[in-house]
């Protein structure tokens, strides 16, 4: 597993404890109570490091190569999954995976953005950057869910919509705008979870829902830290400053009324314990579905409409107000 800079001290300590345990099998260098003390110290070290992460370090966790992807969540959460492909206009976009899913006996339409897990699959999935046909595919499946009375789960994980010439020629902006318009009035419950990167319109095109949640170390922003740094300072070394200024993580966005919930990750991030992460996301989805399933359609749509009409809280100082 690839090590992030802030993880090195923890891994070295874990290796030391593992070495002691191995040597103990032959020589009994340390008693079990002494080993336990070392493990307790390791727990305190982890708590100290992971409770004081900078926004940029959390972005690195969010982008970790071993972080679970949409396909992993499908395997970890669903008893059944039948994939559906194509947008019925141009082609299938592998950056979107969607289909009929069964979770704890309840049927859903699960639609997620997929980056891939190695060089070959990442190139095949275009690194999770959707083309117009990806947004059209997602909307086609969402409308199918509405037709069959199925709740929808959107899993968001993209560095942004594909910015290439071919995507623009096929109507990238139009495809995203159409999704915003159509999903806002879809007559079935929609639950959105940002599981990794949630960047710009590429994320928003699949993030219109009745509830929007984020994993603890995921981010949701109008631009990546690198993009922000290149525009504001023209200096890639300012990525860390940009990540802090963008307020792109769950606790800030919940305070701004942009997301509704932050789902806790295992210590160190989802890649350290994927199974526990699948369980947390599954619990959240089922819990929210129970709240939404009996709402009259008119009330469901009105609440969704008002949610996005009033999204975001901000304050103005009394000084600026008086000047105005």
UniProtKB/Swiss-Prot annotation:
Specify the superkingdom: Bacteria
Tell me which residues make up the CoA carboxyltransferase C-terminal domain. Answer: 41-291
- What metabolic or biological pathway is this protein involved in? Lipid metabolism; malonyl-CoA biosynthesis; malonyl-CoA from acetyl-CoA: step 1/1
Q: Which UniProt keywords apply?
A: ATP-binding, Cytoplasm, Fatty acid biosynthesis, Fatty acid metabolism, Lipid biosynthesis, Lipid metabolism, Nucleotide-binding, Transferase
Which GO molecular function terms does the record list?
acetyl-CoA carboxylase activity; ATP binding; carboxyl- or carbamoyltransferase activity
Q: One of this protein's GO BP terms?
A: fatty acid biosynthetic process
**Which principal EC class is assigned to this enzyme?**
transferase
The UniProt similarity line reads: Belongs to the AccA family.
What is this protein called in UniProt? Acetyl-coenzyme A carboxylase carboxyl transferase subunit alpha
Instruction: State the organism's lineage.
Output: Bacteria, Pseudomonadati, Chlamydiota, Chlamydiia, Chlamydiales
């Amino acid at each position: 597993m690839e090590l992030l800079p802030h993880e090195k001290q923890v891994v070295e300590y874990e290796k030391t404890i593992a070495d002691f345990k191995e040597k103990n099998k032959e020589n009994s260098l340390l008693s079990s109570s002494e080993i336990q003390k070392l493990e307790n110290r390791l727990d305190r070290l982890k708590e100290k490091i992971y409770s004081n992460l900078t926004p940029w370090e959390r972005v690195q966790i969010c982008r970790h190569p071993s972080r679970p992807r949409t396909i992993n969540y499908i395997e970890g959460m669903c008893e059944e999954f039948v994939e559906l492909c194509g947008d019925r206009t141009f082609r299938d976009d592998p950056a979107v995976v969607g289909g009929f899913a069964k979770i704890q006996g309840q049927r859903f339409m699960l639609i997620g953005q997929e980056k891939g897990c190695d060089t070959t699959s990442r190139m095949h999935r275009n690194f999770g950057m959707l083309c117009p046909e990806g947004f059209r595919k997602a909307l086609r499946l969402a409308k199918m869910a509405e037709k069959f009375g199925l709740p929808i789960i959107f899993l968001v994980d993209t560095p942004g919509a594909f910015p290439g010439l071919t995507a623009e020629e096929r109507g990238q902006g139009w495809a995203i705008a159409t999704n915003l318009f159509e999903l806002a009035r879809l007559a079935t419950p929609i639950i959105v979870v940002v599981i990794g990167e949630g960047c710009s319109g590429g994320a928003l095109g699949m993030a219109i829902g009745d509830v929007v949640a984020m994993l603890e170390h995921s981010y949701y922003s109008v631009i990546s830290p690198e993009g922000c740094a290149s525009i504001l300072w023209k200096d890639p070394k300012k990525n860390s400053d940009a990540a802090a200024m963008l307020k792109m993580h769950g606790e800030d966005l919940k305070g701004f009324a942009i997301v509704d919930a932050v789902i806790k990750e295992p210590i160190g991030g989802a890649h350290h314990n994927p199974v526990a992460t699948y369980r947390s996301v599954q619990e959240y989805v089922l819990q929210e579905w129970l709240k939404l399933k009996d709402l009259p359609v008119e009330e469901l749509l009105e609440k969704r409409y008002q949610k996005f009409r009033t999204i975001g809280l901000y304050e103005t100082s009394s000084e600026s107000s008086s000047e105005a």
